[in-house]
């Protein structure tokens, strides 16, 4: 069986060896130096389909599968934009789409998806039963990754010190404990788009995988975006976010200051920052298309933007938080 030495040498390993490798580096007696070596090796050599499936075999054992959608990005695109996936998830929920979001605090950027929810005052569910209750009662739940995959805590220090996207950035988007049947995944890596499409198709999920040609792990409003649509087969196409959202200012959706990003995020969801609102609506579009709420990106964008401008989206966040106050220990 191939192992750590092979990965460090830049060699690929088979599915079973990858599973065993994760079991080794996730043990408490494995040193951070060893973990860093493995994560760095994967960063430079890339991850194959077989290796990805091996890691999934070791980590991912969902007990349920819900008719809902997760929208998530890998992070690591170094753009320091607002957390658009979480805001888009709330917009989608306001339009009647069940959203089961799985995420974490930022490890490489200024502001992570869980940071947004924590700043809103959200109390994260502690188990699958509580998560299912939240989803049923308000069409929305946000699950914090380390709560459901405790081993992730072991890697948090190493990931922050490395400062670049690791294998866990790419694993995270497919590890949702409620196993929602629909996924929208933004990838900072072109190579990982094909891995995701293969994995999600193999697992029987419907999915839209996106990557901006400027490197953004979202639909970019500044360039073309590559898209892979997965639904029993795989279709590739390109979306021009510039022609859909029209003149989004980069300095209104991006900053290295977490407090400013937080401000942009909430103002965007309220419709008070038009550039951020457009960016959020643009990235809500694939969720609406996946759920047959719109037939094309232009119509989906307009529907999402109207939900923001009318106050419907922010009212949804307020409803989520109102219910959340009575569920602090669930």
Curated annotation (Swiss-Prot):
<keyword id="KW-0479">Metal-binding</keyword>
<feature type="binding site">
    <location>
        <position position="217"/>
    </location>
    <ligand>
        <name>Mg(2+) 2</name>
    </ligand>
</feature>
<feature type="binding site">
    <location>
        <position position="73"/>
    </location>
    <ligand>
        <name>anthranilate 1</name>
    </ligand>
</feature>
<comment type="similarity">
    <text>Belongs to the anthranilate phosphoribosyltransferase family.</text>
</comment>
<feature type="binding site">
    <location>
        <position position="218"/>
    </location>
    <ligand>
        <name>Mg(2+) 1</name>
    </ligand>
</feature>
<comment type="function">
    <text>Catalyzes the transfer of the phosphoribosyl group of 5-phosphorylribose-1-pyrophosphate (PRPP) to anthranilate to yield N-(5'-phosphoribosyl)-anthranilate (PRA).</text>
</comment>
<feature type="binding site">
    <location>
        <position position="104"/>
    </location>
    <ligand>
        <name>anthranilate 1</name>
    </ligand>
</feature>
<feature type="binding site">
    <location>
        <begin position="101"/>
        <end position="109"/>
    </location>
    <ligand>
        <name>5-phospho-alpha-D-ribose 1-diphosphate</name>
    </ligand>
</feature>
<dbReference type="InterPro" id="IPR035902">
    <property type="entry name" value="Nuc_phospho_transferase"/>
</dbReference>
<feature type="binding site">
    <location>
        <begin position="83"/>
        <end position="86"/>
    </location>
    <ligand>
        <name>5-phospho-alpha-D-ribose 1-diphosphate</name>
    </ligand>
</feature>
<dbReference type="GO" id="GO:0000162">
    <property type="term" value="P:L-tryptophan biosynthetic process"/>
</dbReference>
<dbReference type="GO" id="GO:0000287">
    <property type="term" value="F:magnesium ion binding"/>
</dbReference>
<dbReference type="GO" id="GO:0005829">
    <property type="term" value="C:cytosol"/>
</dbReference>
<protein>
    <recommendedName>
        <fullName>Anthranilate phosphoribosyltransferase</fullName>
        <ecNumber>2.4.2.18</ecNumber>
    </recommendedName>
</protein>
<feature type="binding site">
    <location>
        <begin position="76"/>
        <end position="77"/>
    </location>
    <ligand>
        <name>5-phospho-alpha-D-ribose 1-diphosphate</name>
    </ligand>
</feature>
<dbReference type="Pfam" id="PF00591">
    <property type="entry name" value="Glycos_transf_3"/>
</dbReference>
<comment type="pathway">
    <text>Amino-acid biosynthesis; L-tryptophan biosynthesis; L-tryptophan from chorismate: step 2/5.</text>
</comment>
<keyword id="KW-0328">Glycosyltransferase</keyword>
<feature type="binding site">
    <location>
        <position position="218"/>
    </location>
    <ligand>
        <name>Mg(2+) 2</name>
    </ligand>
</feature>
<dbReference type="InterPro" id="IPR036320">
    <property type="entry name" value="Glycosyl_Trfase_fam3_N_dom_sf"/>
</dbReference>
<keyword id="KW-0057">Aromatic amino acid biosynthesis</keyword>
<feature type="binding site">
    <location>
        <position position="85"/>
    </location>
    <ligand>
        <name>Mg(2+) 1</name>
    </ligand>
</feature>
<dbReference type="Pfam" id="PF02885">
    <property type="entry name" value="Glycos_trans_3N"/>
</dbReference>
<dbReference type="InterPro" id="IPR005940">
    <property type="entry name" value="Anthranilate_Pribosyl_Tfrase"/>
</dbReference>
<dbReference type="InterPro" id="IPR000312">
    <property type="entry name" value="Glycosyl_Trfase_fam3"/>
</dbReference>
<feature type="binding site">
    <location>
        <position position="73"/>
    </location>
    <ligand>
        <name>5-phospho-alpha-D-ribose 1-diphosphate</name>
    </ligand>
</feature>
<comment type="subunit">
    <text>Homodimer.</text>
</comment>
<keyword id="KW-0808">Transferase</keyword>
<keyword id="KW-0460">Magnesium</keyword>
<feature type="binding site">
    <location>
        <position position="159"/>
    </location>
    <ligand>
        <name>anthranilate 2</name>
    </ligand>
</feature>
<dbReference type="InterPro" id="IPR017459">
    <property type="entry name" value="Glycosyl_Trfase_fam3_N_dom"/>
</dbReference>
<feature type="binding site">
    <location>
        <position position="113"/>
    </location>
    <ligand>
        <name>5-phospho-alpha-D-ribose 1-diphosphate</name>
    </ligand>
</feature>
<keyword id="KW-0822">Tryptophan biosynthesis</keyword>
<dbReference type="GO" id="GO:0004048">
    <property type="term" value="F:anthranilate phosphoribosyltransferase activity"/>
</dbReference>
<feature type="binding site">
    <location>
        <position position="81"/>
    </location>
    <ligand>
        <name>5-phospho-alpha-D-ribose 1-diphosphate</name>
    </ligand>
</feature>
<keyword id="KW-0028">Amino-acid biosynthesis</keyword>
